[in-house]
Amino acid sequence: MTDTISILQLSDTHFLDDGAEAEGGGAYNTSEAFDAVFDYIGDHDHLDMVVVTGDVADHGKAAEYRKAADAFSRFRVPVNVCPGNHDFDAAFTAGIARIGVSTSRVIEVGAWAFLFVDSSAGKMLQQENGLHIDPPGETRLHSNGSLGAREAAWIDQMCETTNAEHIFVWLHHPPQPTIPMCHDDAYAAEWHDILNAHAKIRGFGGGHTHIPNDYELLDRPVFVSPSLKNNFSMEPQTWLPPGYRTYEFGADGSVNSEVQLVDDERWPRLPFGSLLASLFRGEITFAELDEIIARRSDVTGD
């Protein structure tokens, strides 16, 4: 292995069981999208690792994780996965593991420590036996990030005890995203406290928004990966094809990343309407969007 570490990031793969309907509608066929992305990547033997940052399954079902694990195991390099808000703990833990596919929390390579954070941990319920589970009867499909005291303390501990010179955080919810509908003041505050305490953290790789971009938070880069379910650009306001991100990590602490989108006529870059724009700007909620679409369907008879 050279001093440079090469990693490929997938996010928001949203695998579906055969015949199942995608949550929220407007979705690509994610199995088809994965195949297209895998073919577009081509030779990947130079990679040190593939990282998947959550929303692995669309409904958090065991069959969806089996499909995802089968897909990820096609890579000839190690794959490591962390959960997103669509991923339900028990099914995720039981279904994703395969030879070469893992859910490790910390991976140290060369000068780097890669932390894999559960950015929905603050929404979990602690049982009497100490295990954390999804609250029964509740959904976090459209929820923003929340570390909670337990996950934040774990991050602090890892940052304080690692011998690595540099730390990079992989997670589903990017901290303080630039997309208004995904911004959460409490979640941003959690990360401000952590970043102010740990100078070794060099940046973040996340997903969740389905709007690939990058920005800075307290002088650290935050890289947001494309999705396989649907992708959007805000400038111009268009749909985007499925894709992924590539990363190069230098021994000096440098991080370089690029978005890669599949060039395929199956996913044309068409304009999207004002309703989606209003959703992304935080002017309406998902529930309000569903109500508007339902009213329009009643009028048109669709």
Predicted feature residues:
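Short, flexible/disordered intra-domain loops and linkers
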Residues: 20-29, 179-185, 233-237
